[in-house]
Amino acid sequence: MKKLFNNLPFRLLLGIIIGVILGQVFPESVMKVIVTLQYIMGQLITFCVPLIIIGFIAPSITKLGKNASRLLGVAIVIAYVSSVCAALMSAGAGYALIPHLSIDTEVAGLRTLPDVVFELNIPQIMSVMSALVLSVLVGLAATWTNSKLTCDFLGEFQNIVLDIIGKIIIPMLPFYIAATFCNLSYEGMITHQLPAFIQIILIVMAGHYIWLAVLYLLAGAYSGKNPWEVLRYYGPAYLTAVGTMSSAATLAVALDCARKSKVLRKDMVSFGIPLFANIHLCGSVLTEVFFCMTISKILYGHLPSIGTMLLFCALLGIFAIGAPGVPGGTVMASLGLITGVLMFDDAGTALMLAIFALQDSFGTACNVTGDGALTLMLTGYAEKHGIKNNDNIQSPVL
């Protein structure tokens, strides 16, 4: 029994179940405490995200040496191609399926969550994108100048971050996820809004699994390795993403899952997973495209033209690379495209945000799980091009 409770996937599932049940029975007075605890834990996790990014990407780049610039370019290209192809697949499914769906536009109202008892703001030392850019620039500059002092410092900083992950973030995650689902259950989002859009959500989730299968099959074919040896370890990361709705907040668990795989090079994991958590949002892109087409049909009576959707998908792939890996980050970053390319009005934008929020957790889980496939591609690329293996980073013990 003790071994079972020490298992991270079990603790995450238990947190989800307990959170949903308690959200149905807790009064407003107790929910004030839950909302406050969830807020504080979320603040702490969010604060640590830039540290995790810097602690893994920068030292990983220094260990890649002269190959750093080339690998960074390869990573960005495959992340963009994955997102755009997922968007195009979603658009094709939209043209084929949406005209035949009977979608109810009436959405039940939600209860309002009580305010937090007190606010404890823990602002990040920098934004996620700033941390990503800083990591890349410092890592590349340290490599170009052969700065041993900087490289050693980054290695020590990585060890510090690993301890923060293993001793603070991961033990706290089940409680954070339980509080999150308690809030959703109390609001009524789980019991009322989800059934209203169950058709399109199920279709989108099926699209997630189809695209993940495509990614892992392509990664396996290119690398010559068994993709199941990566995917089989991603259960905890998938569940964490469902609970946090954030690729960035799931980063700690995703790193540990990927490092358990025997077919992934550890240097590629330390370089690729934190990078892809911020630039590879294939699940969110796939979801947004299908939902935009659905809302266009509901509110405006027609689907966008093929030319419009091709432009939207191509631009959305670029916006996804720059979108923050936080809840709703993709749709928030692309609001300009939704209003400028698809010509959505305020009603369309509001409905898009509401529906997207219902399944944001599963889109995020697709993003995170897809990162493993792209890291397998990076591993294959490194081995095919004779890039030296720097497998000397220890993983946190969960």
Identify the meaning behind each predicted range.
Residues 69-75, 166-170, 261-277, 303-307, ...:
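Membrane-interface alpha-helices at helix entry/exit sites of multi-pass transporters
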Residues 233-289, 317-331, 358, 362-377:
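Alpha-helical membrane segments and immediately flanking helix-loop junctions
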